[in-house]
């Protein structure tokens, strides 16, 4: 009698649950049942209104398997979800996507690296799917935070650490691809997200062994010489892609975190990494946005007007690189303002040098005074060289105006009327 009761109750279960249960073998090592998966896919395509229930039931099973550490069944559930996502593109896919993202989040929250990588791979597949209609309410805040945390993994095992970081970078790249072209997801460009995205990429790019290579366009990225994925190269590729998609209104939020990261990690002296970053920026953005980057570096220089000479020199040298790469005429509409900023810092540097020189005998030793003076000379030479590159990027009709502007702005110390020798500028 009990057996008869069980036989009667079995068919009472909803068909979608029976179809879902059938894809899970008794032994998870046998993997996903392909024939039963085909039946489930056909059912989902034929009855798309059932997709949300299928997703909810799969999510329920996956959560239970994660808690019980039955990771073989977790892998099967995610494989089934991936196939359903690829096969179904109707309006009813949206509730299913919500269940899918909840399951991905469940895996990312796990402390198991294998589950984190599994969840990331599924998210990347989802990110490459073009949905028929945009989502008005979907948010990716959690994924930005979680993938960014994975990018900073400090796992004890180097190989596992690399796997987690690579997965985090791929996840961020998936978020970027899913959101940057969607006007409804413009929130991704807001500071709270860029302040996580950009530093995560730069943190991994700092491990690159070839900074000079990193700055040039068309650099092959993603895999090391042994065929394994390299976090530094992958982060650079993602960084380039993000910058290439940035509109003019988003440039400030994209570049500011770079400047802050360089400040926080003291990367202006020496400035090889800073130069590499801005080469990548200038080669990746649209040419008409170049002057916006130049202006941001100038503004950042203003905030460091009282810092150590070598830090200021490092910023000026980065500015020089951006100007050298910028297209002709891309300095922007406020040309004289740009030159005025540079000349202001040149004058301040000279003032610092003269002040130190006058106090040298009473406050510091001769050797340290000369060292301070030589450091200020480094700043001055960098500024003068940058002014020259700016002049080289100007149209011919503006150069005479700029030369007159410079001559009127920079007097030579010790003479009442003479002006700076401008033969080396422009």
Show where each model-derived region lies.
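HEAT-repeat alpha-solenoid elements in large eukaryotic scaffold proteins
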Residues: 25-41, 54-61, 70-85, 114-129, ...
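Long, well-ordered core segments of solenoidal/helical folds
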Residues: 104, 200-209, 342-350, 409-411
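Charge-rich, solvent-exposed alpha-helical interaction surfaces
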Residues: 15, 19, 57, 146, ...
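Phosphoinositide-driven peripheral membrane association surfaces
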Residues: 59, 102-111, 116, 302, ...
């Amino acid at each position: 009698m009990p057996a008869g009761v069980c036989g009667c109750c079995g068919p009472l279960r909803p068909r979608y649950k029976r179809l879902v249960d059938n894809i899970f073998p008794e032994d998870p090592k046998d993997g996903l049942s392909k024939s039963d998966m085909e039946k489930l896919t056909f059912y989902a395509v034929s009855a798309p209104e059932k997709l949300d229930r299928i997703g909810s039931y799969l999510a329920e099973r996956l959560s239970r398997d994660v808690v019980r550490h039955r990771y073989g069944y977790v892998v099967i559930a995610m494989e089934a979800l991936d196939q359903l996502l690829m096969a179904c593109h109707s309006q009813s896919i949206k509730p299913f996507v919500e269940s899918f993202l909840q399951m991905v989040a469940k895996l990312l929250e796990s402390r198991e690296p294998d589950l984190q990588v599994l969840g990331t791979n599924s998210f990347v597949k989802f990110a490459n799917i073009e949905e028929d209609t945009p989502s008005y309410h979907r948010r990716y805040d959690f994924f930005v935070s979680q993938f960014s945390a994975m990018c900073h993994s400090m796992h004890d095992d180097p190989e596992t650490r690399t796997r987690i970081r690579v997965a985090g970078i791929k996840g961020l790249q998936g978020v970027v691809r899913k959101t940057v072209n969607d006007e409804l997801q413009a929130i991704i460009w807001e500071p709270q997200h860029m302040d996580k995205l950009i530093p995560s990429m730069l943190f991994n790019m700092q491990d690159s062994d070839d900074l000079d290579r990193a700055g040039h366009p068309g650099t092959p990225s993603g895999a090391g010489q042994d065929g394994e994925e390299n976090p530094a190269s992958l982060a650079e590729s993602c960084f380039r892609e993000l910058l290439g998609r940035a509109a003019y209104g988003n440039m400030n939020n994209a570049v500011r975190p770079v400047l802050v990261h360089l400040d926080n990690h003291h990367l202006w002296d020496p400035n090889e990494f800073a130069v590499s970053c801005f080469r990548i920026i200038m080669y990746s953005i649209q040419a008409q946005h170049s002057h916006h980057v130049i202006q941001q570096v100038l503004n950042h220089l203003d905030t460091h007007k009282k810092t150590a000479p070598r830090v200021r020199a490092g910023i000026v040298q980065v500015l020089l690189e951006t100007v050298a790469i910028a297209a002709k005429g891309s300095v922007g509409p406020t040309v004289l303002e740009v030159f005025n900023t540079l000349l202001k810092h040149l004058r301040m540097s000279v003032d610092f040098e003269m002040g130190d020189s006058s106090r040298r005998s009473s406050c510091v030793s001769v050797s340290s005074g000369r060292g301070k003076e030589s450091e200020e000379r480094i700043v001055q030479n960098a500024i003068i060289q940058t002014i020259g590159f700016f002049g080289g990027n100007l149209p011919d009709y503006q150069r005479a105006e700029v030369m007159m502007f410079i001559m009127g702005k920079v007097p030579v110390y010790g003479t009442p009327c003479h002006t700076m020798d401008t033969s080396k500028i422009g």
